[in-house]
Amino acid sequence: MNILFDLSGCNQPYNAITVYGLRILAGFKENGYKDISILCDARIYDHVHVTFPEYPCLEIAFDTGRNPMTLLRNFRHWKNTVKNIEHDVLFVPHVFPPNFCFHRRDKTVLVLHDLQGLRIYKGLRLWACRFFYPLALWRCKASIVISDFVREDVRKTYPFISPRKLNTIYNGVVVDQLPQKRDTLPVKGKYLLYVSSLMEHKNVMTLLRAFNRLKDKIPHTLVIIGKTRPVWTEKAL
């Protein structure tokens, strides 16, 4: 079975979705699976090609801009490129960009990370989520969800989507490959570590309030690592 990994929607090598896709690829590589091709944005091509030299890696460059004509040109470019790549399964690690919604549904496996776009976005981005989340789930052959919570959220939000399409596969991390450098940490003693983007829906404020209640009862320091957001500087600090 030939799998086409569609990373064309990832334009930064250390973006969360890119990292997720590359971890999946690393798992296939470690288990000796060979029938894989990778389609990736020109901006991450070198990174992906160097990381996985054993897999054919095809570069695709999109026009910049968000006007309708640009989006249409990019979709046609993507469609023609994918059509010319032999594959049995198209693996898509994220709903956006939703080019795959107009691909053959019997070939597409989608990863749905959550439905937070329905709750945190406004305006055009919110309407895009409202339209493409259910369309993507309807058009794909199968969907991977990263937790049972997400699976139940999908079932409640879109009861018309068959639960047989939704397959829970948790995110994985190879712990043995993580470097152990405790002596270089700026924090001494015990600590609680939070790593994620500092967005409001991540509930960092609740974490801070909870730690504030416990800080005099436990010996731990709270360490927070993440990309700063306006809510962080406005409320937390």
Regions found by a protein language model. Name each.
Residues 1-237:
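Carbohydrate transferase catalytic cores enriched for Leloir-type hexosyltransferases
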